[in-house]
Regions:
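The feature captures the beta-strand-to-loop junction immediately N-terminal to the Walker
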Residues: 36-38
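Conserved ABC transporter NBD signature motif
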Residues: 58-72
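Catalytic Walker B motif of ABC-type/P-loop ATPase nucleotide-binding domains
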Residues: 149-153
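ABC ATPase "signature
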Residues: 208-209
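Helix-to-loop junction immediately C-terminal to a conserved catalytic motif
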Residues: 51
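ABC-family P-loop ATPase nucleotide-binding domains
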Residues: 81-136
Length: 231
């Protein structure tokens, strides 16, 4: 088992406000990990640093053994918390775009998932329901052969039926030697598929542990443990 993500004593500030305070975090290959914390806890900043959207001048993050840069952008596949595609784009346009942008994009896998979800390639993003537009974004993200997949609030405004479909996409696409990091407030929807959970508060990691261990030691579900920690 190899280390996919490594953060060591990572600190990041916006002016005088500290967003992350000496964060150390390792994610191993083959793991599905939940990242949980209230708004303003540092989740978004951490994701932006991992994806290279903002820069850590001290280079305290590595993905697949590489410092954040062009090489890591090629092995990190990221889905933001909002659908990022223009409404006048057809689904097929997005397939073409991903095929051009990413050498590791598996178009056949993406098209197979579209059929399973009853989404047509000629459909316009703006004509799809919010749930279906979210599904398209996630299946495109998961159709790359990446080392680390990051989904930020994949269930944002999505109904329970659509959430179930999105979870099936996640599980059906992630390779065994990759890692999947999911940041969501919908803990109950993902608890059963998680190997590990990371709780973050005020820029600090409260704990990073096996979900099974948390249940066994607390006698509570992960969602209940979260409520206890952050009430």
């Amino acid at each position: 088992m190899s280390t996919i993500l490594e953060c060591k004593d990572l600190t990041y500030s916006y002016g005088k406000k500290t967003a992350l305070d000496k964060v150390s975090l390792n994610l191993e290959s083959g793991k599905i990990v939940g990242l949980f914390g209230p708004n303003g806890s540092g989740k978004t900043t951490l994701i932006k640093l991992i994806t290279g959207m903002i820069h850590d001048e001290n280079n305290m993050i590595k993905v697949c053994g590489e410092e954040i840069g062009e090489k890591t952008k090629a092995v990190v596949s990221y889905s933001p918390d909002r659908v990022a595609f223009k409404r006048d784009r057809k689904v097929n346009d997005l397939l073409d775009m991903y095929e051009l942008m990413y050498e590791d994009f598996d178009r056949k896998l993406a098209e197979e998932n579209l059929k399973k979800l009853n989404i047509e390639k000629e459909d316009y993003i703006g004509k799809l329901s919010k749930g279906n537009a979210e599904k398209v974004q996630i299946l495109l993200t998961m159709s790359r052969k990446a080392g680390l997949y990051i989904l930020d609030e994949p269930f944002n405004g999505v109904d329970p039926v659509a959430r179930e479909s999105i979870i099936k996409i996640m599980l059906g696409c992630v390779p065994e030697d990759s890692s999947l990091l999911i940041s969501t407030h919908q803990i109950g929807d993902v608890e059963q598929i998680l190997d590990e959970a990371v709780f973050i508060k005020e820029g600090k990691i409260l704990f990073h542990r096996s979900v099974d261990e948390i249940r066994e030691e607390t006698g509570r579900s992960l969602a209940e443990t979260y409520m206890e920690e952050f009430r």
